[in-house]
Amino acid sequence: MSVLGVICGLAVAPASTSPSPPAPAADSGCFTIYKLQHEVGAETYVWSRAAGGRTLTTRWAFRYLGSDVRLETTLETTDDGRPLRLRSLGQTSTLTDVDLSVELNAARATVRDRGGTRTEPASGEVFPIHHYPPVALEEALLRFWLARGRPAAVPLAPAGAASFELRGSDTLTLAAGPVVARRYSVSGLLWGRQSMWATSDGRIVAVVNGDAELDRFEAVRGGFESQLATFVRAAVRDGLEELQAIARRTPPVRQGDYAIVGARLIDGTRAPPVDDAVVVVRAGRIAAVGPRGSVQIPKGTAVIDARGETMIPGLWDMHVHFEQVEWPVAQLAAGVTTARDVGNELELAVGLRDAIRSGRALGPRMLLAGLIDGAPGGLGVQLAGTPDEARAMVRRYHDAGCEQIKVYQSVPPPLVSVIAAEAHRLGMTVTGHVPTGMNAFQFVEAGADQINHVGFVLAVMTPPPQPGQPRAPVDLASSEARRAIAFLLEHHTVLDPTLARSEENAHPKDSLLAVYEPGAAKAPPELAEVLNASGSPGDVAARRMAGLARALPIVNALRAAGIPIVAGTDLVVPGHSIARELELEVRGGFTPMQAIQAATIVPARVMALDGESGTVEPGKRADLVLLDGDPLTNISEVRRVHAVVTGGRMFLPAPLWRSVGFAP
């Protein structure tokens, strides 16, 4: 039973061996919805006969992190399955909504959405569907594709095209007997690819993908829930194969031994920039660094002319969730060479980390923080309810090679100290959200080393609000603020404030995100649609944006007091938002150099990897970024990546961006 009381334990119908017809005139079903393999709700659907055709009505309802998500969609078709009209109203995630009508008539499509009403040419082979759609609507699209002889692509209305690639078949072992499901890789319905399983008559069994808020999402037909682990493993395997194919299609433009000559070097150490610098790369490491006249380039070494460019250390993003395989490629294109994943499905996170580490796949070097939450309403499947369960989860993550534990907000407060003690015993550190029932002081006193999101810190910098009243703005001269800063300093607490994520949530919903984050304008249309549906309405947006404006100088004050501030994005626009994080830091009072250090040497030091990364110095990994501009003059120049070097392998960003659907 789902958390909303919908039962999906339906009988499994035998697969038909006949050619794929349209959906039957009368049919119904249910899909259990999961986020990070944790059941959160269900989608139900019914096909009914109407005058001259059939109607699909599908509803999904789930509860995620305290928010309800509901969506209702109707599709009207002719008896032979040709779509006539679509209506979809509700939410595609806790952050995004849809209000769409499409009517197909006489080679025209009339579309009504947030952009108004428009009429466009459309052939009879167009299918009406929005991005991040309900599963039953995808099933109608799959049957449409099968009935038309499996064309290379199906044009969609309002926009785009969908394609299906058969990846293989999986035998699913059920109590009633084995069921063979075809496994497809589907593109065009969301950013990246979706894994889909269907019987031979086009009946969808399961889908696995990133959803409209870029979380890992699974939907499984009633009766097939026991096969969730099979679907998860196969989706990871296919995703990693696609990531490796991207690596084969976008090889490095330089690797091995070479020298980069003529760039202006910002080495990240606080030393003044070096004009006309030379950096010698040998076997993936920095062999020599200095002004041109002081560095001898070994005979026979290839030389790269970087005059007019600026070199900085490879960037770190300390708050990522690589919940689909396209993420690490986008991050690398933006100059991120090290990323900390702070909450993911372990199967995917470990698979990505290992594939990148081996050189089979492209992306930043990954550090992992294993997620632990509590029930009910927790995130993921590692839900601790007892000390023994908590310790076992920490050990599992340690054995998987995780550097940290990520505590989430439903962990019972008494278990935080248990988790921290076991993590510290094993040489791991602890980061996370402050759980419900605790404040930041209690969280740190229980053993947390780091805090995600500035809001948890701001909450202890002001007096508790009166019942029914908003919290007062932070006054840095107040005793509460001074006490909080002294406490964090005493405990060496690290903060990743995630300012870009705060802006995404706060900005006015009637303004495109690209007004604030220009990278959103380069996103593929499937992703741009949900990015531009983000934000807050009216007065809520004004209040939240004002709160963000007040928070920026407070983050700078924390940094100035000596509290380590590390740059982390928490999703938003893949790749681009690390630059937005630095821009917001500078707006709050960081110098450009301080912002660069928050994304280089400070996180390297925090993660005890400053001997390997974080600055451009001999002996360290050759993780470098060449920029067509000077970020010390304008921090936004970090967006102008000319080339990125990871472990000595140099890549141009444009092919990387294109490989995951972005405009360069």
Language model features with spans:
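Histidine-rich, glycine-flanked metal-binding segment
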Residues: 270-312
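Extracellular/periplasmic ectodomains of large secreted or surface enzymes and adhesion receptors
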Residues: 217-262, 296, 647-664
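Active-site neighborhoods of metal-dependent hydrolases
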Residues: 393-411, 457-588, 654, 661-663
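Divalent metal-dependent hydrolysis catalytic cores, especially in the metallo-beta-lactamase
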Residues: 328-348, 363-372, 398-411, 429-431, ...
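Acidic, glycine-enriched loop/beta-strand segments at the rims
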Residues: 173, 248-252, 265-278, 291-292, ...
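Contiguous hydrophobic, core-forming segments of folded domains
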Residues: 66-138, 191-195, 200, 205-211, ...
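Solvent-exposed helix/loop surface patches that form functional interfaces
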Residues: 24-26, 40, 92-180, 230-237
